[in-house]
Amino acid sequence: MQYKTKAKKSLGQNFLQDENIIRKIVQLANIKKHDIVVEIGPGLGALTRYLLSSSNNVSVVEFDASVIDTLIANCQKYGTPHIYNQDFLKFDISSLENSSNQKIKLIGNLPYNISSPILFKVIKDSDKIVDAHFMLQKEVVERIVSLPNSKSSGRLSVILQYHFDCSMILKIPPEVFYPQPKVDSAILRLKPKNSKELLKNYNFFEEIVKQSFAQRRKTLHNNLKSILKERKIDPSTLPVDTNLRAENLSVGDFVSLANFLS
């Protein structure tokens, strides 16, 4: 592996370099030859090489043009991925060569500074994917997989858990990266749910979740006061206790609340 390229702090780059960890990630992602795999932020190709050994159809989306020559050189013995030199946030998954309309597997070591926008984009593309395996800050993964009545619960966890079964499947120490980050990392698995609770208005559901967590220390009654007043709704008639905080509610509670207020 060549590591000539200097990691760019502005892009949140930390290059994965431990072969055992990389093999473990690919194994956990359960990638087969027929799978269509898209890697987000391949960097220097440490993970890409193993993906090319596992699948016949690997695409990579890399924003940083300066790493692409090194990426190609590092992958040379294993094959050539389809390279898209662009921002994943603007990438159209439908543009992939996929004549059979086969769903894809997403994987990647996500830049810490834009992990949330990427996850919200993945939500929009959830009907096109089989699953996703992302490396993120361990603290972020813990928030995403958190259960009701946890102080880690938040907008991101509720929205993601509405769409996906979310699980933390591997913890990763800082020393397996170059340069070493100051935090631990973990692998998040997202698997689209086969069936979701029906919502009358999805956008309104997102708005209710956002408003409910607007000020975490406040109760639902205080955070949703303007919405309740606008709709002339008595808080005592709601399907949830508005004296609770947002962190106390389950995804199902938020669905019931949004449907009631729609």
Swiss-Prot record:
Primary residence: cytoplasm
InterPro entries: KsgA/Erm, rRNA_Ade_diMease-like_C, rRNA_Ade_Mease_Trfase_CS, rRNA_Ade_methylase_Trfase_N, rRNA_adenine_dimethylase, SAM-dependent_MTases_sf
Keyword hit for Cytoplasm: yes
Pfam families, alphabetized: RrnaAD
Enzyme kind, highest EC tier: transferase
Key words of the record: Cytoplasm, Methyltransferase, RNA-binding, rRNA processing, S-adenosyl-L-methionine, Transferase
Compartment(s): Cytoplasm
EC number in record: 2.1.1.182
Listed PROSITE patterns: RRNA_A_DIMETH, SAM_RNA_A_N6_MT
Binding site for S-adenosyl-L-methionine: 14, 16, 41, 62, 87, 109
Entry function: Specifically dimethylates two adjacent adenosines (A1518 and A1519) in the loop of a conserved hairpin near the 3'-end of 16S rRNA in the 30S particle. May play a critical role in biogenesis of 30S subunits.
NCBIfam families: ksgA
Name of the protein this chain belongs to: Ribosomal RNA small subunit methyltransferase A
Organism of derivation: Francisella tularensis subsp. tularensis (strain SCHU S4 / Schu 4)
Taxonomic lineage of the native organism: Bacteria, Pseudomonadati, Pseudomonadota, Gammaproteobacteria, Thiotrichales
